[in-house]
From Swiss-Prot:
It comes from Cupriavidus necator (strain ATCC 17699 / DSM 428 / KCTC 22496 / NCIMB 10442 / H16 / Stanier 337) (Ralstonia eutropha). One of its GO terms (cellular component) is cytosol. PANTHER family: TRANSCRIPTIONAL REGULATORY PROTEIN YEBC-RELATED (PTHR12532:SF6), TRANSLATIONAL ACTIVATOR OF CYTOCHROME C OXIDASE 1 (PTHR12532). InterPro entries: Integrase-like_N, TACO1_YebC-like_2nd/3rd_dom, TACO1_YebC_N, Transcrip_reg_TACO1-like, Transcrip_reg_TACO1-like_dom3, YebC-like. This is Probable transcriptional regulatory protein H16_A0916. One of its GO terms (molecular function) is DNA binding.
């Protein structure tokens, strides 16, 4: 099954994340804290905590930092009380954007998100205005050249929903969100460690941008990503090289 070219977009996002490692750690600590607070400190019974710890370890976060975040979440240490908020909005040409936040000050966060949208040619929508354009799923992306048949066999055996080969040769595997950790472990045991693996809001359709519009759209996405309270930004925009 063929899909759109997205390897360049994934590489851009990964490079940007690597460039701001300290900020990534801050976001992951907040996520671990909230996951532990909501579901307890046992990773065997808390899939969200297991996922956030996996991401922290992939980002080379020291185990002491991870443990302190868990303790803070379950009440062993003082820490900020974060709440989860999702904002939805539009970029250029009506491109859909979802902004997931963890914040201890809702008023500050909504003002910053709204300012980023308006400054860069977008606008905020109401709750539910674009979320229906996305599917909540586990996503694994493999570089062009990965053996497709072997990966497909391993993925389907692991419990994946779909395996898609994109136009650029990269391969995308998706699975139900709750099965993410099990599928990830099974794929890695079979020798397939993904370049990017996460639980995401995957767009059902995509909008391509090139030239000046691509640059403007990227500025909007970067402005949202760089806000301290923002954890994740999802969009159906595809930025062409």
């Amino acid at each position: 099954m063929a899909g759109h070219s997205k390897w360049a977009n994934i590489k851009h996002k990964k490079a940007a994340a690597d460039a701001k490692r300290g900020k990534i750690w801050t976001r992951l600590i907040k996520e671990i804290t909230v996951a532990a607070k909501l579901g307890g400190g046992d990773v065997d019974s808390n899939p969200r905590l297991r996922l956030s710890i996996d991401k922290a370890m992939d980002a080379n976060m020291p185990k002491d930092n991870i443990q302190r975040a868990i303790q803070r979440g379950v009440g062993g240490m003082e820490g900020a009380n974060y709440e989860e908020i999702r904002y939805e909005g539009y970029g250029l040409a009506g491109a859909a954007i979802i902004v997931d936040c963890l914040t201890d000050n809702r008023t500050r966060t909504v003002a910053e998100v709204r300012h980023a949208f308006s400054k860069h040619g977008g606008n905020m929508g109401t709750e539910g205005s674009v979320a229906f354009m996305f599917t909540h799923c586990g996503q694994f992306l493999y570089a062009p050249g990965t053996p497709e048949d072997k990966l497909m066999e391993a993925a389907l055996e692991a419990g994946a929903d779909d395996v898609v080969t994109n136009d650029d040769g990269s391969i995308e595997v998706t699975c139900p969100p709750n099965d993410f950790s099990a599928v990830k472990a099974a794929l890695e045991a079979a020798g397939f460690k993904a370049e990017v693996a996460d639980v995401v809001m995957k767009p059902q359709n995509e909008v391509s941008f090139a030239g000046d519009d691509a640059a403007k759209m990227q500025k909007l996405l970067d402005a949202l990503e760089n806000l301290d309270d923002v954890q994740e930004v999802f969009t159906n925009a595809v930025i062409e090289d």
